[in-house]
Amino acid sequence: NSNEAREEVKGHPLSFLRVGKPEIDLDPGIDLYDVRVYEKGKENLLKLIKDGIIAEDPERYFYVYAQTMDGRTQYGLVGCASVDDYWNDVIKKHEKTRKAKEEDRSNHVRVTNSHSGPIFLTYRDVNAINEIVDEVCKTTPDNDLVAIDGIRHQSWVIRDKQINAKIEQILAAVPCFYVA
């Protein structure tokens, strides 16, 4: 919630929570769905870009992301999905979402021109994707850090255009995805 996020970012001016939950930098009395909240998110994002903290990739890429906790590593493929797939039920929902929350996230994306919060999707196992992920993970990660909670986070950018095209082709053949 917003109060927990306010506590979390104290002493962390570069926290991306300031983009995804920008109300934490505003008076707590302001309504969460007020346009000023979205504008603050955009302002915070543009400051991170201007200061060189984050940058938009020059091309569309897929990424491999790994989390290691208690000796167990889980891997994921990171990319973008079409909102049309959500509305057309290619992406299956496991619960009813609140209309106000959907509109909130849509407004946030529209105003900031970014999607700051990941949505975890799962799909039936595809060996070809697993093989690509295995190969990518044999290389040195682009990012490798252990967070204060002890969880190790690693990520690899897949810059090879042919591999990205292959992943896109494979995923296009997946009949449906599920919100995890």
Regions found by a protein language model. Give the residues of each.
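A cross-family signal for N-terminal binding/gating loops and helix N-caps
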Residues: 1-178
